[in-house]
Amino acid sequence: MWKTTDLCDEFEKELQICRQSFRSFGKKEQFHGKIATVKVKDDNVLVKEGLQTLPEGTVLVVDGGASTNCALLGDNLAAIAEERKLAGIIVNGYVRDSSELKNVNIGILALGTMPNRSVKEGKGERNISLQFGGVEWKPNDYVYADEDGVIISEKSLHR
């Protein structure tokens, strides 16, 4: 069993430590996997497309620009991620349906909750490098998240 604290101790020079605080909404407090990315502004169509197409064990990282205008993830999209056996979702933005999300058996991190839904225009970008939390989120890098924080590495760190 790995912990981000132990990985930081062992691989300090080989990883990035996210400086942004997230709240945990999913059932899993600890999760890891290869990163896939989506960048959107108040529109979650590409989030849904990513969840429907990513391979098992992936962590979808969504950069919503920390917008407080709407939620980018709710119970319906989280159920898709759980059904497809994704490891987790990290949202630089907000979620809704939080009472249902706590029963979804994946990791879900976000800044907080917002009750209103996003627009559905399909605008945004997928599979690009993202910058938030003081780190670079690159597709196919590895992310590790638990109760102590979020770290990123170019290679798999746990055994």
Swiss-Prot record:
One of its GO terms (molecular function) is oxaloacetate decarboxylase activity. Divalent metal cation. Substrate binds at residues 74-77, 96. Its EC number is 4.1.3.17, 4.1.1.112. Pfam families: RraA-like. It catalyses: 4-hydroxy-4-methyl-2-oxoglutarate = 2 pyruvate; oxaloacetate + H(+) = pyruvate + CO2. Keywords: Lyase, Metal-binding. A divalent metal cation binds at residue 97. Its cofactor is a divalent metal cation. GO terms for biological process: regulation of RNA metabolic process. SUPFAM superfamilies: RraA-like. Catalyzes the aldol cleavage of 4-hydroxy-4-methyl-2-oxoglutarate (HMG) into 2 molecules of pyruvate. Also contains a secondary oxaloacetate (OAA) decarboxylase activity due to the common pyruvate enolate transition state formed following C-C bond cleavage in the retro-aldol and decarboxylation reactions. Homotrimer. Belongs to the class II aldolase/RraA-like family. This is Putative 4-hydroxy-4-methyl-2-oxoglutarate aldolase. It comes from Bacillus cereus (strain ATCC 10987 / NRS 248).
